[in-house]
Amino acid sequence: MPKLVIVESPAKAKTIGKYLGRGYKVTASMGHVRDLPASTLGIDVENGYTPKYITIKGKQKLVKELKAEAKKCDGVLLATDPDREGEAISWHLANILGLDPSAPNRVTFDEITKKGVKEGMAHPRAINIDLFNAQQARRELDRLVGYKLSPFLWKKVRRGLSAGRVQSVAVRLIRDRELEIENFKPDEYWNIDALLNPQGEKGEFTARLAATADGKKLTVTNKQQADGILAALDGRDYTITKIEKGKRRRQPSPPFITSTLQQDASRAFGFSATRTMRAAQTLYEGVDIAGHGTVGLITYMRTDSLRIAAEAQAAAKTFIAERWGDNYVCKTARKWKSRSATAAQDAHEAIRPSMPELPPDEVEQSISGDTAKLYRLIWSRFMASQMADCIQDTVSASITAGDYLFRASGFRVSFDGFTALYEESTDDAKKKETALPPLEEGQTLKLKKLTADQKFTQPPPLYTEATLIHALEENGIGRPSTYAPIITTIVDRGYVEKDQKKLKTTPLGQAVNTVMMEQFPDIVNVKFSADMEKKLDVVEAGQADWVKTIDDFYQGFEKSLEQAEKNMEGKRIKVEDIPTDEICEKCGRPMVIKSGRYGKFVACSGFPECRNAHPLVKDTGGLCPLDGGHMLVRKSAKGRVYYGCSNYPKCNYMTWDEPVPEKCPQCGSTLFKKKGQLYCAKEGCGFVKAIEKK
């Protein structure tokens, strides 16, 4: 009789089944099989917060099949993912199948390769009850907050609303940033730059005014001051008074953890956190690679550990030496400090290729799209982390002109090191530092141009998915498995919307945030939430009781809820409408954008006297190739975005391909984007060009 091995997904089952062979039957639970009921609280608060788990709707048949398979097999091994959620799935499966959770029937795989599966199968263990309790505590806390807060929001804001323990903090962070920008008062300053070049030499460069000649720092704050300095510099010689040379070593970034992978994929490819994790899950669970069969290409992707296995480091360094040469290999074992608060969180490695010797060029013959992009990113980042530093020769020049001191700096790369393979993407558009021409102390320079540019200090930018995830991580909010769901949830609930990658609160999100800030300050307090996460980590480490942790929170929360009911008795928060420049054709009043249960729509501001309304459509700025109408964003019945002409039904042109701002160089029509290329849809044009990779 074979042994039954249960994993979460069919893809994972297929890969593991290939390695285990005939003595095992591998099947999938399709994720969680039990949870708290959707229609009731499902927690006995008066009896030690005992959960009332039920089989998830639609999973009854699957559970029945798993029980039947278990009876036909010689034992069961639970091989769900190596994290809290995976441990919880295994605990529930053990409960359903009548397995002893303290028996060695739990196996985990940090990587789904022949070696990784063999290693996992060789070390079966009991279910980690502390890990399960941490998951159970998080689930109950989220249920208690959501189930108790939602009815309150229904009464005070709008029916159908809900609030979450962690999501509410994320909305607050986004709203705080918006208010910071709204209240920002810019300060004027001026940059005074001299375009110089050595007398009789080639190679001009720019130096910036930095101080007075005696070294006192100088800040130019208005035009009058700037004009005075320009006048004082008129006719002055520019002489190099000091040259400083040095060497600068740039170290590579550490391998990815969940948060940094999501941030980098967002910056590099515009991926949402959910899209990144979907592609990473595929790479972890296994894909068919020519010459290798079905193999998991990366280690487990939900981690905040920077630990790397010694054998993976060795394999990477061997490949680096063969590909780039021995001088490109880092000669020491780099160690990075993980943010992990507990040993339980540091159980995994960082995200790395399971086979460092398998470069993206070989893999991309078998995979494409998101998975190919993400594998190249993960492979490159990990390999770079095992490469030598980039070494730069730096030069800094101090230049005196009259009573003022200018400075210029630059560098030349003397050894490219890890940058031969990888450069980390960034959100900041930093000024690029370039090399200076050969310079000597005492040298007189020729002034080609002197400019004074007015500038103003800038507010911090709106959050993107990448920067919000960074802020959540920096503040200790959420954990690797929660970053993507947090963002998905606040967008799906209509509290936040994306506008050109920027995250903005909606009027509904602002109204809910106001209520939360005024009535439930602890729930949206960043430090309080971070402390709660730490307490749950302590539960995970087996150093605190999960029931007491929940009770300590719930006692205070219940009092806040009672007080909020008193504070807002008879009151209701109005969700502000968004004004438009559209006029109601029925009564002449302005039309406004309202938020309803099913999203935004345009309605007459004279409601309820005038009930004129229509769906909200977004204009892409592109024009229809058939009749010149506006190309609008629309959604299919299944929620898929497509683009259609504003003159529908007179014109029924529609496409799944996104219109872009760039115009056709041949006929001036709107271009559309499809699978790595831009094309013109105007009949008879036929223009097509590949999208350049950045």
Model region roles, listed by residue range:
Residues 1, 81-82, 158-162, 245-254, ...:
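Conserved short loop/turn motifs at secondary-structure junctions
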Residues 1-139, 220, 426:
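Intrinsically disordered, low-complexity regulatory segments
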Residues 2-4, 15, 24, 150, ...:
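Basic, low-complexity terminal or inter-domain segments flanking catalytic cores
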Residues 15-19, 65, 88-96, 116-120, ...:
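Alpha-helical scaffold elements adjacent to nucleotide-binding pockets in ATP/GTP-utilizing enzyme cores
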Residues 112-194, 245-246:
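C-terminal or mid-to-C-terminal helical accessory/interaction module adjacent to the motor/catalytic core
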Residues 138-149, 166, 196-198, 248-260, ...:
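Core structural elements
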Residues 214-254, 443:
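Metal- or metallocofactor-binding catalytic centers and their adjacent structured scaffolds
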Residues 240-243, 252-265, 292-300, 459-471:
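Short acidic, hydrophobic short linear motifs in intrinsically disordered regions
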